[in-house]
Design a protein with these regions (language model features):
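Cysteine-centered metal-binding/redox modules
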Residues: 123
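Long, charged alpha-helical interface segments
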Residues: 111-113
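Conserved mixed alpha/beta catalytic, RNA-binding, or beta-rich assembly cores of soluble enzyme
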Residues: 20-80
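General beta-strand structural signal in soluble alpha/beta enzymes
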Residues: 68, 98-100, 134-137
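A glycine-rich helix N-cap at a beta->alpha junction
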Residues: 82-108
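SAM-dependent methyltransferases
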Residues: 1-32
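Short active-site-adjacent helix-start/loop capping segments
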Residues: 75-77, 106-109
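C-terminal binding/interaction regions
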Residues: 117-118, 126-136
Length: 137
């Protein structure tokens, strides 16, 4: 996305066709924070949104860490329609997956082998140290 204002008081934007996820100057990768499972208000619409979002993540090569917290951990539950897409992301892009142990416990969700259950303190430190953080909420 490029900002092309015609005057000082006007903002216009030019959208690129392809998704742009820029790395920081030091080559750092993007940290993706998923805080919501999108199923609460409209199941079908929420599932379609999250699957589409995860499908877009699958097409990128610079997601280094995925953090799941709050109801976002519910996408790890058996039978979740997003679990297969998340598995594809893990198999192709190999990001590190951190799950909030408090959230896993609250929602009764098990942490899969490809992820690491960590305390909320570790989650917050990871978020604070992230140079490029994208939040899905």
């Amino acid at each position: 996305m490029k900002n092309n204002p015609e005057t000082k008081s006007e903002l216009t934007f030019e959208l690129e066709e392809e998704l742009e996820m820029e790395r920081s100057a030091d080559g750092g990768q993007v940290t993706l924070l998923i805080k919501h499972d999108y199923f609460s208000s409209d199941n079908e619409h929420g599932r379609a949104l999250l699957k589409s979002f995860l499908g877009t993540v699958l097409d990128t090569q610079n997601v280094g860490t995925i953090i799941l917290t709050d109801s976002g951990v519910k996408i790890l539950a058996d039978g979740s329609p997003c679990l297969a897409v998340l598995n594809d992301i893990i198999n192709i892009n190999m990001p590190r997956v951190l799950c909030c142990s408090d959230s896993l416990s609250f929602y009764g969700t098990a942490c899969p082998d490809f992820a690491e259950a960590v305390s909320s303190r570790v989650i917050f430190i990871e978020i604070m140290e992230s140079v490029n953080l994208i939040t899905a909420e």
